[in-house]
Amino acid sequence: MNITQLWIYPIKSCGGVQLSEAKLGERGLEHDRQWMLVDREGNLITQREIPKLVWVRPSISDNELNVSAPDMPDLSLERSATGETKRVRVWGDHMDAFVLPQACEWFEGYTEREVDLVYIPDSSPRPMNPNFGTRHLTFVDGNPLHIISETSVAELNSRLEKPVGLERFRANIIFSDAEPYAEDTWTKISIDDIEFDVYEACQRCVMLN
């Protein structure tokens, strides 16, 4: 198995950032799904509700999160945040997150919705499924890392009238040189002497098509 691509998605349900190397932390790859958009009640907002979020392009530089989108001025934010907190929800999980008021006007202008951009610090607990471990999560759906095989997607595309790109699956680690769907049977993988448990298949949503 060879790793061919590394990706993070700093703002949940927005564009990804391809990396040449990544820092692995307690909650997964550094800055992956560490920000997200919520409505005034703290409920997660995704491309299901606002498809144009696909064109929001985050990037990380020095101590800033930079954001761009078509017909919008560039936005720069401090990577960490302090100040007002808000109780937010990712599916069935509730947690405290910092509100970034300086981003509110920008995202409301782009989405034409009342939204807040929030940030989850390492100090905010969000335990993963206790059947899988004791780690805490960012704003990911369920697990710290998502892997996918190029050969599995290639085999899938051989049976589709309209192929789907690897990027549609929004995985963190993309690898090659494995039999199609071999990852479905794995319980552990090792990368540079670091061992990872493979818990479950990731259920993808309508964003695939």
Please report, for each region that a protein language model flagged, where it lies by residue.
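Metal-cofactor-dependent catalytic cores
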Residues: M1-N209
